[in-house]
A protein has these predicted regions:
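Metal-dependent amide/peptide-bond hydrolase catalytic core
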Residues: 195-196, 200-203, 210-395
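Acidic/His- and Gly-rich active-site-bordering loop/insert found
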Residues: 1-92, 101, 108, 112-123
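Short pre-catalytic strand/loop immediately N-terminal to key active-site residues, enriched for Gly-Thr
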Residues: 85-94, 371-379
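Histidine-centered active-site/metal-ligand motif
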Residues: 15-17, 92, 96-99, 160, ...
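Histidine/acidic-residue-rich, glycine-tolerant segments that coordinate divalent metal ions
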Residues: 53, 73, 81-91, 98, ...
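Short, flexible, mixed-charge acidic loops at enzyme active sites
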Residues: 75-83, 175-180, 352-367
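Solvent-exposed residues in well-ordered beta-strands and their adjoining turns
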Residues: 55, 69-71, 130, 187-191, ...
Length: 395
């Protein structure tokens, strides 16, 4: 079986059985089945996590870690491919099936290299298959399990397939690559009365939760424009719910969104600013509020020294000019040990045809991540596997 056939089998098998969050029994069983014949120690250091440790056999005391996320999304697949999801309402729409396939193929490479070419793998290797990247940050539970200390892991690498880059493009940068994120929920409390009773009532005595929410959203947008002039900062609120009927003042309003920044200083400034404009909006309408800032994910911040160490082995690596305002829980690993995260392009090159194979899978991604038609061809994963090989052969 060629490496492409191996990658295709893993990816399509896993694409058929998407599971969510920490509830991953079929996915875990599949990964354990692939790892079972390999000369590795398989452990479960925390709930719904699978780790595979390979002793390089050269007396190494340190290990290189490779991370793959396992969870899918609550999306009903609409691709029509022969290997589509068999779990209604669930889909691998973020490429985690590809991430797992690359890691599994890398594990078989390590096993073969240790057996057939002793000494070529100079460091021990730890593969980490983690749950809940899309939800609560499963990486954090892995870090807290002590698995890195147990196996002497002192560096970690990971990938994300990326439709915005041409297929096969390898991209990253030293320092911040992806943003810090924080879900923000606001509950505004007013008083619901019939609108007929509001005539002549001053705005500051209206207790109108919908009006307070509207004032907040306008002011918050102006705040972000000011903060964003200093460095990248986004605070967007995509959820607004208020009131129950059309002819009564809204007694309650719920506003929810996400804050994205790259530095702790800007995170603090943005949170303070949001609280200030919310204070002003509620004071102006006679309302009160409850505000919840989730801590969210830290920024993905690639270790500069490790980046400089690996860059000579990755001559095709494109350096990202500006960090991206998306978030990834790989960031938690980088709080525990040096790490580098890569983006792997899956998009169609400009002017390139996009044929489909016999199973209906296009050669290049045609849709964005988190959409019900997101697909890519496994040939792209060969690039990721090749990068993993080069990283694992480094001292």
């Amino acid at each position: 079986m060629t490496e492409l056939q191996e990658l295709r089998r893993y990816r399509r098998d896993l694409h058929r059985i998407p599971e969510l969050d920490f509830d991953l029994p079929q996915t875990i069983a599949y990964i354990e089945g692939v790892l079972a014949p390999l000369a590795c120690e398989v452990t479960h250091p925390c709930p719904s996590c699978v780790c595979a440790f390979f002793d390089a056999g050269v007396g190494a005391t340190h290990a290189t870690a490779i991370r793959a996320d396992m969870d899918a999304l609550p999306i009903a697949e609409a691709t029509g491919v022969a290997f589509a999801s068999t779990h209604p309402g669930k889909m691998h729409a973020c490429g985690h099936d590809g991430h797992m396939a690359m890691a599994l193929a890398a594990a078989t490479f390590v096993d073969r290299a240790i057996r057939e070419q002793p000494g070529t793998i100079k460091r021990n290797v730890l593969f980490v298959f983690q749950p809940a990247e899309e939800t609560t940050g499963g990486a954090k539970t892995v870090c807290e399990s002590g698995v890195f200390e147990r196996y002497g892991a002192d560096r970690i690498f990971g990938f994300h397939v990326w439709p915005d880059l041409p297929a096969g493009t390898l991209a990253s940068c030293p320092g911040p690559l992806l943003a810090r994120s924080s879900e923000t929920h606001i509950h505004i409390h007013g008083t619901s009365i019939h609108i007929a009773k509001t005539y002549g009532v001053p705005v500051e005595e209206s207790h109108d939760a919908a009006l307070a929410a509207a004032k907040f959203l306008v002011s918050e947008r102006e705040l972000m424009d000011v903060l964003g002039a200093d460095e990248p900062c986004i605070g967007k609120f995509g959820l607004l719910q208020a009131g129950t009927v059309c002819n009564a003042v809204a007694g309650e309003a719920h506003v929810a969104g996400s804050l994205r920044v790259f530095t702790d200083d800007m995170f603090d400034r943005a949170r303070e600013g949001v609280r200030r404009v919310l204070d002003e909006a509620c004071a102006a309408t006679g309302c009160t509020y409850d505000l919840d800032f989730a801590e969210g994910y830290p920024p993905v911040d690639n270790d500069p020294e490790l980046f400089a160490h690996i860059a000579p082995a990755l001559s095709e690596l494109q350096v990202v000019d500006e960090p991206l305002l998306i978030a990834e829980d790989f960031a938690f690993y980088q709080r525990y040990l040096p790490g580098v995260f890569f983006l792997l392009g899956t998009g169609a090159p400009a002017g390139q045809d996009n044929p489909s194979d016999s199973d209906g899978c296009p050669a290049y991604a045609t849709s964005a991540l988190h959409t019900d038609t997101m697909l890519f061809d496994e040939e792209i994963l060969l690039k990721g596997l090749d990068v993993y090989k080069r990283l694992l052969l480094l001292g």
